Amino acid sequence: LKCNKLVPLFYKTCPAGKNL
């Protein structure tokens, strides 16, 4: 899944540093 801070579910799948 692509990093997407607009979607909490996707946001949680983002590695640290990739959640910007």
Curated annotation (Swiss-Prot):
Function per UniProt: This three-finger cytotoxin has antiproliferative, cytotoxic and apoptotic activities. Both in vivo and in vitro experimental results suggests that this protein possess anticancer potential. Also shows neurotoxicity, cardiotoxicity and myotoxicity.
Compartment(s) where it occurs, according to its Swiss-Prot or TrEMBL record: Secreted; Target cell membrane
Quaternary structure and interacting proteins, as annotated: Monomer in solution; Homodimer and oligomer in the presence of negatively charged lipids forming a pore with a size ranging between 20 and 30 Angstroms.
Lineage of producing organism: Eukaryota, Metazoa, Chordata, Craniata, Vertebrata
A Gene Ontology term for the protein's cellular component: extracellular region
Family according to the record: Belongs to the three-finger toxin family. Short-chain subfamily. Type IA cytotoxin sub-subfamily.
Alphabetized GO MF terms: toxin activity
Organism this protein belongs to: Daboia russelii
Descriptive protein name: Cytotoxin drCT-1
Chief place of localization: secreted
GO biological process: apoptotic process; killing of cells of another organism
Tissue-specificity statement: Expressed by the venom gland.
The entry's keywords: Apoptosis, Cardiotoxin, Cytolysis, Membrane, Myotoxin, Neurotoxin, Secreted, Target cell membrane, Target membrane, Toxin
